[in-house]
Amino acid sequence: MIKLQNKGVTLQGGVPTPAEAVFPAGRDKTMAYQILRRHDRPCGDGSMHLTFDSLISHDITYVGVIQTAKASGMTEFPVPYVLTNCHNSLCAVGGTINEDDHVFGLSAAVKYGGDYVPANQAVIHQYAREIMSGCGRMILGSDSHTRYGALGTMGIGEGGPEIVKQLLRNTYDIAAPEVILVWLTGQPPQGVGPHDVAIALCGAVYKNGFVKNKVLEFAGPAVSQLPMDYRIGIDVMTTETACLSSIWETDDAVAEYLAIHGRPETFTALHPQDGAYYDGMITIDLSRMEPMAALPFHPSEAVTLRELIHDPGDHLREVEKRAEAQFGGKAGLHLTDKLVNGKLMVDQGIIAGCAGGMYDNIAEAAAILNGHDTGSGYFSLSVYPPSVPVNLELMENGVQQSLLASGALFKPCFCGPCFGAGDVPANNGLSIRHTTRNFPNREGSKPSDGQLAGVILMDARSIAATARNHGVLTSAADVDYTPPAPVQRRFDRNVYDRRVYFGFGHARPDAPLKYGPNIAEWPAIPALADDLLMQVASVLRDEVTTTDELIPSGETSSYRSNPLKLAEFALSRRDPDYVPRAKATQVLEASRAAGAVPPALAEVLRSLDLPESALARMHIGSVIFANKPGDGSAREQAASCQRVLGGCANICYEFATKRYRSNCVNWGMLPFTLAEGAAFDGDAGDFVYVPGVREKLARGDEEFPAVLVHKGKAQPITLYLKNTSAEERELLLTGCLMNHYAAQNRR
């Protein structure tokens, strides 16, 4: 189905051809570089310094973004900035705090000149597709699934501080990325949907890092054969491959989509130029695709549904082993209990949001369920359309009525099932979902309370087939159904014109920001000291640590407008002792600053053979060790929560994503790495001493000799800060992005 070629490729006469040599200049002929160059402010340093046509955030990120930008000197939004309300839109946790955030968001749109999309009108990425996309554009979003490549728009998802930089008229700085050609051939068989293709792609490239921090460029004869919703459904899942961004060839289907959405002038035909050079190629033969499943706990745990249905026991036992390895005795997952007479019984089906909720997916699900029902047992099916305009189409064409008659439930335009804020399964429940992720606990369970559930990612088509079989896992390839007849798509913009606040270009500086009692300013962040003494607050030896583990989503997201309250939940579902340990380190630092030397600190000084006078040059903070932290969400709070608890660094072998590393840097946490194969023997409570860290960082050193104090004994280790730009070093020296810009404003 999928072939990887880890060698250079050029397009010659529209045909991929092995490149005889590396030809970086040929990247300028790719669609990606044609767009990137137009958005670059070159500084002669070989990096790209990008500006964006528009920005977008949702209601669990925009408060922090605006608070940071305000503290950094922002007076108005210089580019279109859209604030959507699709994550905490249930307003079901914490009393008034969620709606308080929404009120704050509207007041910020009025004051600074932004656009505000009220709750339940649209999920963030569907609104961007319908209203903001256009060929050759670039959009930066504070959500990792900011992907609009199928519409000719390069989307990048980053943490909130990168949005802040754009609001302050600065740039998004990256090394010039490699580009991977994704060559599509064939036509997918009936019953195979975009999520099947996406899961297979994730399975092929995630674990080997084949596309990490690269741009995926989709081309080939099959592109023109795919409907727009199909392309969009594949594209949004490219985030799960760890790539930087994506772009697709554009054609008449894209032109029609943009025209239907009232923006025909934003269409431009995009194609690679002859001689375009790619750093590798992925060939996908769609005709050989099968319905797929991504087992817990990652979209890359790909297996064909055919295999899973034929031999469920072995696959489920592997999942149980992964759960046992991660959660130990805190919570158990016993999915083999779901086997009844050799068949796998699932408890719940969800079709939702920016990946699953598109019109075509829901219409196909309705066709599969037509004349059937979901049963009256434990299994339930819920459908979340991505926007009110799409929901109106589903109603007008009878799709919604058909699904309701079959026993499915329609719910608001809401991202909840994707991050644990809606339709949380029962303990030991098994949910099949056409959503973006199935990380541990992302469905909402709490291992610290003995809860655990599992999510298998599947396409809407096979979810509907399973619903038709009353919860018995079923592939859409194994059911007979008549696909829905093509319909003339339409878009009713009046929905938005009547409800959305369009404020760009109409800032009202005298208008007040409206604060609820939970919305708090960022606490003071210290600058980097001459020497650094770090106490290990958590050691995470899992292969990968996700941002969902670093700061859980779900109901805790309601507290993201209050940095100190939110920090209480840091690592709560992975290492509940992290917060108490980090706070204990803060007490040590407070004692040092007051001139006291507690016994624990005196013991560390003896191990390091340092006099008490060395404390005057030192800062004491906490540090997390993880093998590979930062997969998943763009949420800056994965880093900021550590920072407000006194965190000053991460130590790892590599960062899972560029965006998490950027979040650490923007919050002033040193992104230390270890050499491949180097041991880190530290345990929670141990110390790491980095002498001269400020001086070395200021002069651009990459190697930082350090000392690990483990069980009272000092042992040398070497930490690295590689590929750190001059601006990143300045942010780290000043303590965080806010401090950096505040200092600039004072000058």
Identify what each model region corresponds to.
Residues 1-747:
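Fe-S-dependent hydro-lyases/dehydratases of central metabolism
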